[in-house]
Amino acid sequence: MEVEAVCGGAGEVEAQDSDPAPAFSKAPGSAGHYELPWVEKYRPVKLNEIVGNEDTVSRLEVFAREGNVPNIIIAGPPGTGKTTSILCLARALLGPALKDAMLELNASNDRGIDVVRNKIKMFAQQKVTLPKGRHKIIILDEADSMTDGAQQALRRTMEIYSKTTRFALACNASDKIIEPIQSRCAVLRYTKLTDAQILTRLMNVIEKERVPYTDDGLEAIIFTAQGDMRQALNNLQSTFSGFGFINSENVFKVCDEPHPLLVKEMIQHCVNANIDEAYKILAHLWHLGYSPEDIIGNIFRVCKTFQMAEYLKLEFIKEIGYTHMKIAEGVNSLLQMAGLLARLCQKTMAPVAS
């Protein structure tokens, strides 16, 4: 993956005008200073500042313009901007009344039926003066963590207070939301962010925070983020705070996952049918304490971009997939991983004449 400094454009971020607290900048690692997390400091405040998922965000912009918002469910992987999008929508709709007319709950903590009966119902009953056509908004983050009983109670509450209140649910998997709630909501789906989209935001933050970096450092951050903007910014800030410089070595010290260069070398040995050298690297990663899930995940991600014959790459990915399935089912021994390497080496060997 080649890293290009993609800056500006729709992905440009502005620091919030109403930051709850300033970020006091001192030398990285120095004690006695408070640093606002960059995830919060550079959180978008307007819908047009959100990176990625342009089609879905444009639908939210239509809701914000027209003011007639349905109940909505936003489903997608972590760190793609689901909660931020809902907050931006609420800010655009409610304006100065945001504090009084919005209730935000994290359903992974407040997940029981009592929360629906007490907090949500009491807020829905409150009278708030709003412009014509505007409604109070209740945001339920991690809504797929709610119990079935709480979701059934929420369904009834959504019906009773539909004239005054709108519900916005953010979740990772929409299939964990019961059908009656899904049928009452517009379901919007977010996908993982691309490397270029993450790079755009990283470059903007790097410029504002004056972070020294190398291209391989940015490549490492994007590799470890896996389409998650929150993780990318957290890894960037953690590496800068700990080392003051962004390069691949420092990033992998912070993220601590199997180094892709080692994994790449291991795959190269498999392509060369050198099982002994490949196993040495696997055993080294195993004894460093990495879980089989971490190792197999990185083998797959490195293999996708590895330069080899296309037919061979397809065979490799098929074997990696089978092994990943066995590991997920609980068969996660070193022997299982060694068997994968043996099968990969076998794919590259010329058949023995009988």
Curated annotation (Swiss-Prot):
Q: Which residues bind ATP?
A: G76, P77, P78, G79, T80, G81, K82, T83
| Molecular functions (GO terms) | ATP binding; ATP hydrolysis activity; DNA binding; enzyme binding
Main localization of the protein described in the UniProt heading: nucleus
N6-acetyllysine, modified sites: K163, K304
Tell me where it resides: Nucleus
Task: Tell me the segments the record calls region Disordered.
Answer: 1-29
Output the CDD domains linked to this UniProt entry. AAA (cd00009), HLD_clamp_RFC (cd18140)
Question: Which biological process terms from the Gene Ontology are attached to this UniProt entry?
Answer: DNA repair; DNA-templated DNA replication; positive regulation of DNA-directed DNA polymerase activity
Signal sequence span is none
Q: Per UniProt, which keywords does this protein have?
A: Acetylation, ATP-binding, DNA replication, Nucleotide-binding, Nucleus, Phosphoprotein, Williams-Beuren syndrome
**Database matches in Pfam families:** AAA (PF00004), Rep_fac_C (PF08542)
Q: Which NCBIfam families match?
A: PRK00440.1
Q: Which disease is it linked to?
A: RFC2 is located in the Williams-Beuren syndrome (WBS) critical region. WBS results from a hemizygous deletion of several genes on chromosome 7q11.23, thought to arise as a consequence of unequal crossing over between highly homologous low-copy repeat sequences flanking the deleted region.
What protein is this chain from?
Answer: Replication factor C subunit 2
Source taxonomy:
Eukaryota, Metazoa, Chordata, Craniata, Vertebrata
Source gene? Answer: RFC2
